[in-house]
Amino acid sequence: MGKASRDKGARFERSLASRFREYGYDARRTAQYCGKSGDAADVLGLPGIHVEAKHVEVMRLYEWMAQARRDAQAGGRNALPAVFHKKNNAEILVTMEFEDWMSLYREWEAAHDLKEREQNG
């Protein structure tokens, strides 16, 4: 990987951490803290999520998910692997495995149902 490509990836990781902070999460890019340990997420700060960040024009989602899954398991924190990816001049998208997405959705649904019950007395 060339320097320009590495720099582009680092900028995206910093930008992603900044976006997470906008939502109230204490997020940071990890490369400068962890080096290349193999199990560190690209960005820390979303509890329970292993963040793999990719800013490239050619998508290799299955390869990236495999990397995220391996790294999440190696980290031993039981985090759900997720790939945050984008192309130039495009929105950030998130890819997760189906079962992991359903797990998140069930948690959201349970919180939503609880909120409705509290509002309806």
Where are these regions (language model features)?
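Catalytic phosphate/metal-binding cores of nucleic-acid and nucleotide-processing enzymes, i.e., regions
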Residues: 1-121
